[in-house]
């Protein structure tokens, strides 16, 4: 129970830090840490597939894209070092306070699929998507296809200067 509460509290603190930091580089680092921590929380809750997708999509693709944009801003190194003072002490303090004030005992492993013996969450997600929600999945694919064709229809045609 201590690790679950600590991870959720860290998610809350990181989401506040993303909005309140003044440096775009530190805001990006806090958002990457937030995505990694949220995938850790999803993994603890039993959503393994969503945790892996969260890591692959957000941390992998968006972080690399934003890092290239931030590298183009050319922020001085002295400004980056000024933002890292004092945050480790605050993190250790919050971790200790959370451990001291634990009220409920540890309840053991919990997940979303405790009633089904031998089934994994990815298998259950596949059964739910392709058996029960197949019509919504097909409708979603049609909407995305229309959006793709709409993007090409609306985009202006560029001509060369000849």
Swiss-Prot record:
Q: Name one Pfam family in it.
A: Oxidored_q3
What's a single GO CC term here? mitochondrial membrane
Compartment annotation = Mitochondrion membrane
- Signal peptide residues on this chain, from the entry's feature table: none
Topology relative to the lipid bilayer, per the entry, is: Multi-pass membrane protein
| EC code(s) of this entry | 7.1.1.2
Q: Name one GO molecular function term.
A: NADH dehydrogenase (ubiquinone) activity
The residue ranges crossing the membrane are: 1-21, 32-52, 55-75, 87-107, 129-149
Per its record, the protein catalyses: a ubiquinone + NADH + 5 H(+)(in) = a ubiquinol + NAD(+) + 4 H(+)(out)
What keywords appear on the UniProt entry?
A: Electron transport, Membrane, Mitochondrion, NAD, Respiratory chain, Translocase, Transmembrane, Transmembrane helix, Transport, Ubiquinone
Top EC class, one word: translocase
* Taxonomic superkingdom: Eukaryota
Indicate the family of this protein: Belongs to the complex I subunit 6 family.
Q: What is the role of the protein in this entry?
A: Core subunit of the mitochondrial membrane respiratory chain NADH dehydrogenase (Complex I) that is believed to belong to the minimal assembly required for catalysis. Complex I functions in the transfer of electrons from NADH to the respiratory chain. The immediate electron acceptor for the enzyme is believed to be ubiquinone.
Q: What is this protein called?
A: NADH-ubiquinone oxidoreductase chain 6
């Amino acid at each position: 129970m201590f690790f679950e509460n600590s991870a959720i509290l860290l998610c809350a603190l990181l989401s506040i830090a993303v909005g309140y930091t003044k440096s775009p580089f530190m805001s990006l680092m806090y958002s990457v840490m937030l995505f990694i921590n949220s995938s850790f929380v999803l993994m603890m809750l039993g959503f393994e597939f969503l945790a892996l997708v969260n890591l692959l999509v957000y941390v992998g693709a968006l972080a690399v894209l934003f890092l290239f944009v931030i590298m183009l801003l050319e922020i001085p190194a002295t400004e980056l070092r000024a933002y890292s003072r004092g945050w480790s002490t605050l993190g250790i303090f919050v971790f200790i306070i959370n451990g001291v004030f634990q009220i409920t005992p540890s309840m053991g492993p919990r997940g979303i699929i405790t009633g089904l013996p031998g089934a994994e969450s990815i298998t259950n997600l596949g059964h739910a998507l392709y058996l029960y929600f197949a019509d919504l999945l097909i409708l979603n694919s049609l909407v995305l296809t229309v959006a793709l064709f709409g993007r090409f229809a609306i985009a202006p045609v560029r001509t060369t200067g000849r």
